[in-house]
C-alpha cells in the first residue's frame, strides 16, 4: 500500500491509505466490530468443588446461555506476567488439544430444570468451566498439606505447561469460545457455520476491500473496533475518542495538524458501517 499508515492496539484496528485529495476534504471509511459474544474468565477464577476444578466466569455480550453447555470449548487469551512479558494462550483448537466444557444435567434428572423458561434454564452463575477432575499425585508432602488436590493439579499443569502461576490470572485476559474451525454447512456448501461471524465476516470484507484499493481519490480508512456487543463502551469502543485522535495524528503527519482541519476532515467524511443481519428461518 502506498503512503499507508496502520495501527493495531490490542482490540482495535485502524488503517489509512492517503488519497490524492487533501485529508481535510474527508475520508471514505469502512467500519465493523471484531468482538463477539463469549464467556470471560474472571480474575481469581480457579476453585475446587466436590473434587472437581472449575474456572469462575461471566458472560460478555448477549448469549443464549443454554447453548453453551456440553459443547467443546477452547480458551484464548493473553497473560501479562510479573516480569512484563505477555504470553498468548490457545488451548482446545488443535486436534490433540484437550477441550473444556460446561456441564449440564442429564435428562433423567432434569424434570424441574426443563420446566424453567429458556432464559433461566441455565443461569449465568452456572457457566463455570469444568477444567479437571484428577487429584495431584506424586508429591506426598503436598498431598498431606493440600486439601484441594484437584485444584493443586491444575496449578501444577499451568506451571509445567504454560509457565504460569495462579496469581497470573489477575493480569490475564482469557476468553472461552466454541472450539473448532469454521466449516462449510449444507450438502450444497451454501452456508458457513462457525463462531464469531457477527461481525468478523464484515470485518474481513472491509479489511480486504481496503487492501485491494489502489490510488484512491479520497483518503481511505478501515476501522475495526471492540466492545460493540456491550454498547461500544471503554477505551477501545466507539464511545471513546481514539478514532478522532488517530485522525489528528494523521493530520499532524501529513499537514499542519490544525485542529480545525481535523474537524473538517471528520465532517466531510462518508462511512459505511457494516454488521450482520438475521436470515429468514421458516422454522421460527
Regions found by a protein language model. Name each.
Residues 22-113, 118, 129:
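A generic, well-ordered mixed alpha/beta core segment in the N-terminal half of proteins
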Residues 34-36, 61-63, 81-83, 180-182, ...:
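Acidic, glycine-rich active-site loops and adjacent beta-strand->loop/helix elements
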Residues 27-31, 222, 269-273:
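Short glycine-aspartate micro-motif
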Amino acid at each position: 500500500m502506498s503512503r499507508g499508515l496502520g495501527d493495531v492496539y490490542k482490540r482495535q484496528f485502524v488503517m489509512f491509505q492517503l488519497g490524492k485529495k487533501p485529508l481535510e476534504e474527508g475520508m471514505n471509511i469502512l467500519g465493523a466490530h471484531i468482538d463477539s459474544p463469549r464467556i470471560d474468565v474472571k480474575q481469581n477464577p480457579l476453585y475446587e468443588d466436590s473434587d472437581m476444578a472449575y474456572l469462575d466466569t461471566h458472560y460478555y455480550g448477549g448469549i443464549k446461555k443454554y447453548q453453551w453447555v456440553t459443547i467443546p470449548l477452547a480458551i484464548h487469551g493473553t497473560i501479562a506476567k510479573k516480569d512484563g512479558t505477555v504470553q498468548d494462550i490457545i488451548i482446545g483448537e488443535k486436534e490433540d488439544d484437550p477441550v473444556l466444557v460446561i456441564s449440564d444435567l442429564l435428562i433423567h434428572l432434569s424434570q424441574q430444570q426443563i420446566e424453567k423458561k429458556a432464559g433461566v434454564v441455565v443461569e449465568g452463575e452456572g457457566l463455570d468451566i469444568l477444567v479437571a477432575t484428577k487429584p495431584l499425585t506424586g508429591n506426598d508432602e503436598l498431598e498431606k498439606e493440600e486439601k484441594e488436590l484437584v485444584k493443586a493439579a491444575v496449578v501444577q499443569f499451568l506451571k509445567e505447561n504454560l509457565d504460569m502461576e495462579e496469581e497470573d490470572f489477575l493480569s490475564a485476559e482469557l476468553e472461552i469460545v466454541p472450539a473448532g474451525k469454521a466449516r462449510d454447512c449444507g450438502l450444497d456448501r451454501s452456508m458457513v457455520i462457525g463462531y464469531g461471524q457477527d461481525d468478523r465476516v464484515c470485518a474481513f470484507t472491509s479489511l480486504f476491500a481496503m487492501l485491494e484499493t489502489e490510488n484512491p481519490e479520497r483518503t481511505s480508512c478501515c476501522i475495526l473496533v471492540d466492545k460493540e456487543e456491550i454498547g461500544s463502551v471503554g477505551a477501545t469502543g466507539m464511545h471513546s475518542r481514539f478514532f478522532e485522535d488517530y485522525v489528528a495524528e494523521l493530520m499532524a503527519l501529513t499537514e499542519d495538524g490544525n485542529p480545525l482541519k481535523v474537524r473538517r476532515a471528520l465532517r466531510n467524511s462518508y462511512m459505511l458501517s457494516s454488521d450482520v443481519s438475521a436470515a429468514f428461518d421458516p422454522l421460527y
